[in-house]
Amino acid sequence: MSELETGARKAQGKGTPPFAYKALYRASPVDRIGVIKKGVAASDLKRFIAALHVDQKVMFDALNLKTATVNKKAANNQPLSTEDSERVLGLAKLVGQLEDMVEESGETDGFDAPEWLSSWLRQPLPALGGVNPIDLLDTMEGQAVVSRALAQIQSGAFA
C-alpha cells in the first residue's frame, strides 16, 4: 500500500510520474480502493495528464471531470472526490498494465507508456466497433473494456 501512495512522491520533480503505475496495476483491489477513498490529489491528476501528452481539457472530458472543480481543488491542495479518483486511478492502472506488458516483452528501452497509451486511446479500434477507447474512460465498465482490448493486443488477438 505504501508504494501506491508514495511510490512516485519520493521525488516529485517535474519529470517524476505522479503514480507508481505498475505497482497500481499489480496492487490488490482492496489496496486500490484505499487509495481511491483517500482521494487523488488534483495536482497529481494535472501532472498525470501532462505525462500523457494530451490536452488537459480533452482528458478532463474523457474522464467526465469538471475543469473548474479540478483547478479549484488543485489550487487548494485538495483531493478529488471518490468517484473522480476512481476514474483517474483506473486510467493510471491502464498505464501500469501497459508497462507490465512491455516489460514482459523485454523491450522497455525508451518506451514511454503514458505517451503510447494516450496515442492509442485516441485512435478508432476495430475491435470496439470503430470507437476510440478514450470515449469509454468515463465509466469503470468502459475502462474494463479498454483494459481487455489492451490485453488482447499482447495476446495477438488484434492490433
UniProtKB/Swiss-Prot annotation:
MF term (GO), any: DNA binding
Keyword annotations: Toxin-antitoxin system
UniProt superkingdom: Bacteria
InterPro entries registered for this protein in UniProt: Xre-like_HTH (IPR046847), Xre/MbcA/ParS-like_toxin-bd (IPR024467)
Residue ranges the record marks as coiled coil: none
Segments of this protein annotated with the region Sufficient to neutralize toxin: 99-159
The protein's role, per its UniProt record: Antitoxin component of a type II toxin-antitoxin (TA) system. Neutralizes the bacteriostatic effect of cognate toxin ParT by inserting into its active site.
Family: Belongs to the MbcA/ParS/Xre antitoxin family.
Summary of subunit composition and partner proteins: Forms heterotetrameric ParS(2)-ParT(2) complexes. The 2 antitoxin fragments do not make contact in the crystal structure.
Domain remarks in the Swiss-Prot or TrEMBL record: The C-terminus (residues 99-159) is sufficient to bind and neutralize toxin when expressed in E.coli.
UniProt name for this protein: Prs ADP-ribosylating antitoxin
Gene that specifies this protein: parS
